[in-house]
């Protein structure tokens, strides 16, 4: 005789006989046990019966694939996949980025320390009027007006040639500085006071220093094309250096603004010297100027 089958609830089911429980759906029918077992499987709820939950979990395709192994079933867990190469590179900052950030921090700190004439209440506030006078000596407007006046008053071809190239150098300096300032758009230091002499819209930016570029350009131009005594030559170099330093002391620029300005002005003279205007390469310009 075959052993009686048991339902998930633990009660015996007769294969052909009646159920021991009166009023059950399997009572009095040969196929009632099969219907009772089928309905019991349909009516079981997840979590209500542990056996049903285990049955449903074991029959699921995800469990059969082994995508979610039990913590206690295996001796060791699978090692996590290593991050991709790009992610590992992004987590480690480059040496160049660290160097640039360090240089910027040193630049801001040193510029603030050297801004001793940024205001009347600063450490060297009493020297501020003298520094502002030095600021005017390196402004572009006085240099342009002075060069034009000397060019009009000159009566020699050699003098006009030198002055015309100086005018060309000053215009080139204004153009290059304005373009770079518009591209970089670096704000002036926070301790700067807005009392500069004759500023334009682009002058609200600080990189590079126009006074520093002009000082380097003009001093190199004068030393190469004017015959001066040694004390005057030393005075020209000293003027250019003090003018650049005054930009930081007044709080107008950072140290890197002035340093790059000196470099740019030095290179600008090389451009002017390469494109030197003379009666031989641009005779029309000198003839027209001579007729004025």
Swiss-Prot record:
Annotated GO molecular function terms are: isoprenoid diphosphate phosphatase activity; lysophosphatidic acid phosphatase activity; phosphatidate phosphatase activity; sphingosine-1-phosphate phosphatase activity
Q: Where is the composition biased (Low complexity)?
A: 10-25, 69-79
List the GO cellular component terms: endoplasmic reticulum membrane; nuclear inner membrane; nuclear membrane
Q: What is known about its processing and modification?
A: Phosphorylation by PKC activates the phosphatase activity towards presqualene diphosphate.
Chief subcellular location equals endoplasmic reticulum
* Site keyed Stabilizes the active site histidine for nucleophilic attack: positions: 257
Region annotation Phosphatase sequence motif II: where it falls in the sequence: 208-211
Q: Which domain of life is it from?
A: Eukaryota
Q: Which residues lie on this side of the membrane: Lumenal?
A: 153-161, 247-257
Segments carrying the region annotation (Disordered) are 1-34, 66-86
Q: Which Enzyme Commission numbers does its entry carry?
A: 3.1.3.-, 3.6.1.-, 3.6.1.68
Annotated active site residues, numbered on this chain, are 211, 253
Task: Give start-end of the signal peptide.
Answer: none
Please give the function described in this protein's UniProt entry. Magnesium-independent polyisoprenoid diphosphatase that catalyzes the sequential dephosphorylation of presqualene, farnesyl, geranyl and geranylgeranyl diphosphates. Functions in the innate immune response through the dephosphorylation of presqualene diphosphate which acts as a potent inhibitor of the signaling pathways contributing to polymorphonuclear neutrophils activation. May regulate the biosynthesis of cholesterol and related sterols by dephosphorylating presqualene and farnesyl diphosphate, two key intermediates in this biosynthetic pathway.
> PANTHER family per the record?
POLYISOPRENOID DIPHOSPHATE_PHOSPHATE PHOSPHOHYDROLASE PLPP6, SPHINGOSINE-1-PHOSPHATE PHOSPHOHYDROLASE
| Name by which UniProt lists this protein | Polyisoprenoid diphosphate/phosphate phosphohydrolase PLPP6
The organism is Mus musculus
Q: What is the lineage of its organism?
A: Eukaryota, Metazoa, Chordata, Craniata, Vertebrata
């Amino acid at each position: 005789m075959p052993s009686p089958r048991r339902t998930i609830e633990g009660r015996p089911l007769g294969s052909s006989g009646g159920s021991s429980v009166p009023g059950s759906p399997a009572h009095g029918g040969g196929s009632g046990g099969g219907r009772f077992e089928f309905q019991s499987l349909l009516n079981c709820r997840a979590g209500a019966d542990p056996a049903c939950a285990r049955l449903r979990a074991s029959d699921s395709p995800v469990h059969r694939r082994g995508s979610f192994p039990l913590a206690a079933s295996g001796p060791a867990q699978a090692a996590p996949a290593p991050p991709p190469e790009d992610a590992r590179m992004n987590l480690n900052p480059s040496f160049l980025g660290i160097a640039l950030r360090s240089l910027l921090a040193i630049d801001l700190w040193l510029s603030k320390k050297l801004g001793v004439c940024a205001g009347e209440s600063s450490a060297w506030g009493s020297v501020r009027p003298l520094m502002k006078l030095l600021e005017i000596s390196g402004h572009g407007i006085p240099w342009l007006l002075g060069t034009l006046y000397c060019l009009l008053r000159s009566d020699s071809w050699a003098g006009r040639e030198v002055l015309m190239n100086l005018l060309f150098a000053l215009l080139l300096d204004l153009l290059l500085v304005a373009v770079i300032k518009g591209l970089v758009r670096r704000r002036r230091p926070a301790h700067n006071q807005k009392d500069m002499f004759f500023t334009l819209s682009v002058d609200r930016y600080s990189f590079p220093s126009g006074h520093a570029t002009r000082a380097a350009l003009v001093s190199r131009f004068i030393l190469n094309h004017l015959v001066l005594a040694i004390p005057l030559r030393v005075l020209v170099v000293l003027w250019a250096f003090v003018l650049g330093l005054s930009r930081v002391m007044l709080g107008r620029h950072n140290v890197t603004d002035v340093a790059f300005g000196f470099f740019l002005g030095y290179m600008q003279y090389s451009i002017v010297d390469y494109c030197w205007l003379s009666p031989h390469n641009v005779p029309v310009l000198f003839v027209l100027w001579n007729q004025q």
